[in-house]
């Protein structure tokens, strides 16, 4: 049932874990399936105008819809017009071609009359897209001084019944794993797996929220295991200014991680509360924590993304 597998290696993981005195920390971390729950459900209309089919669609990807409708109907793309109005939310769910080809096909088979497909909330949950549930297994080998010697990730992404955006979400998350806390020796494997569940597709963050949840939960586990303050542990291991990822070529240009942590600690009175909330007992307990989040736009080099522009100059330049 494996749709796709991505592996990423840096250094020599097996040799690194033989370093004397290392502390091994491992754990499983899961994120659930989530539906986008945008206010406006999917809706589209189709009507023939001469030899052309004109569609109004609540979509995020009008150009891709045009191509897919043309391919599905076996007609030139130039005979398909997609009009995208302001939509009532999408958050990635409408970044897929959903019902437009069906709506267009019904229209053509009814003599070109106006056809509308208006999907109820129940069908949105079952037959649209959801966020990938991802289960991650992370192993870290840490020195007593709080630095990483080696790290390993295995991530299993629940794709549901159909491919949709497929493995790009899992691959994006796997690609982020070695970036937030750089390490010289890393092994990472990501598996996207078909299941008999609603199809997973794009949703805000595109795999990074699932990855960062796992990484940051694990980071707290590591800090607790070696007896180090979780903020100090993060500051020690976060990507430094000037860091460039070998795979994606992403580069960190400024020290915003530490700046954000400083402001967050000041705003929440973190240090006082962190000490006060230690060693509590009873049914009601208070706690305070902090996590950081690493996200970069687009999915390069997992996938090639393009854009275009048109420039018109006056005679005077």
Q: Where are the regions that the model predicts?
A:
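Structural alpha/beta core scaffold segments of enzyme domains
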Residues: 1-317
């Amino acid at each position: 049932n494996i749709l796709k597998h991505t592996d990423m290696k840096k250094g020599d993981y097996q040799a690194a874990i033989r370093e004397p005195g290392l502390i091994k920390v491992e754990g499983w971390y899961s994120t659930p399936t989530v539906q986008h729950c945008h206010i406006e459900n999917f809706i589209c209309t189709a009507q023939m105008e001469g030899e052309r089919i004109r569609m109004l669609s609540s979509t995020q990807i009008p150009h891709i819809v045009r191509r897919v409708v043309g391919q599905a109907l076996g007609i030139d793309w130039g005979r398909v017009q997609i009009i995208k109005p302001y939509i009532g939310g999408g958050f990635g769910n409408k970044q897929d071609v959903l019902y437009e080809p069906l709506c267009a096909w019904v229209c053509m088979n009814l003599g070109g009359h106006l056809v509308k497909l208006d999907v109820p909330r129940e069908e949105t949950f079952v037959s649209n897209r959801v966020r990938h549930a991802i289960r991650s297994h992370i192993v870290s080998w840490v020195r007593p001084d709080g630095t990483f010697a080696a790290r390993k990730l295995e991530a299993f992404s629940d794709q549901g019944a159909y491919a949709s955006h497929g493995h790009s979400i899992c691959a994006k998350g796997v690609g982020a794993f070695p970036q937030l806390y750089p390490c010289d020796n890393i092994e990472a494997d990501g598996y996207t797996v078909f299941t008999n569940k609603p199809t997973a597709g794009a949703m805000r963050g595109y795999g990074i929220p699932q990855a960062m949840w796992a990484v940051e939960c694990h980071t707290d586990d590591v800090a607790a295991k070696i007896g180090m303050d979780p903020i100090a542990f993060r500051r020690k291991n976060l990507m430094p200014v000037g860091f460039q990822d070998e795979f994606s070529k992403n580069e960190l240009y400024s020290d915003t991680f530490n700046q954000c942590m400083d402001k967050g600690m000041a705003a929440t009175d973190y240090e006082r509360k962190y000490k006060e909330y230690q060693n509590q007992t009873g049914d009601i307990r208070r706690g305070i924590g902090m996590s950081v989040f690493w996200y970069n736009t687009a999915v390069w080099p997992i996938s090639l993304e393009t854009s275009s522009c048109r420039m018109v100059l006056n005679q005077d330049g």
